[in-house]
Regions:
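Gly/Pro-rich active-site capping loops and adjacent beta-alpha segments
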Residues: 1
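C-terminal amphipathic alpha-helical interaction region
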Residues: 4-131
Length: 131
């Protein structure tokens, strides 16, 4: 199973099991969609644009890291919801941390996706001597 498919499985689990994490569910769903679309866009253009990989790499990696961080936070929150009664302070903190990530970090995925799929000539257009 690909990592993207694993994230998708977690999103489905959130959608079916977790009505108490609506923002995390919504933000991770959106971020996954942005990651998938950016990946398809980049792979669809890379053979015709030799500069694309260099131009998009930083923002694409930031997109990947942001989405994967959200995925791991979601997995942690799902486990924490099951175990809250064992240690309410510890597992409650896990849930709050995941909600924070959803509210403050996951929304950045959209900006990274936009930047990663921008025209490579905007990044690579300067000649070496212009630096």
């Amino acid at each position: 199973m690909s990592v993207m498919a694993e994230v998708e499985a977690t999103v489905k689990q959130l959608q079916t099991e977790s009505n108490s994490l609506p923002q995390l569910t919504a933000e991770l769903t959106t971020a996954l969609d942005q990651w998938q679309k950016a990946s398809l866009d980049i792979t669809g253009r890379v053979m015709d644009d030799v500069d694309l990989v260099g131009a998009c790499s930083v923002n694409y990696l930031m997109l990947c890291g942001t989405v994967l961080g959200g995925w791991l936070m979601a997995k942690s929150a799902l486990v924490a919801m099951e175990k809250t009664s064992e240690d309410p302070d510890f597992y409650g903190a896990k849930i709050i941390t995941a909600e924070f990530y959803a509210a403050h970090i996951l929304p950045r995925a959209g900006a990274y996706a936009t930047a990663a799929t921008a025209d490579s000539q905007l990044t690579m257009g300067l000649k070496e001597e212009q630096f």
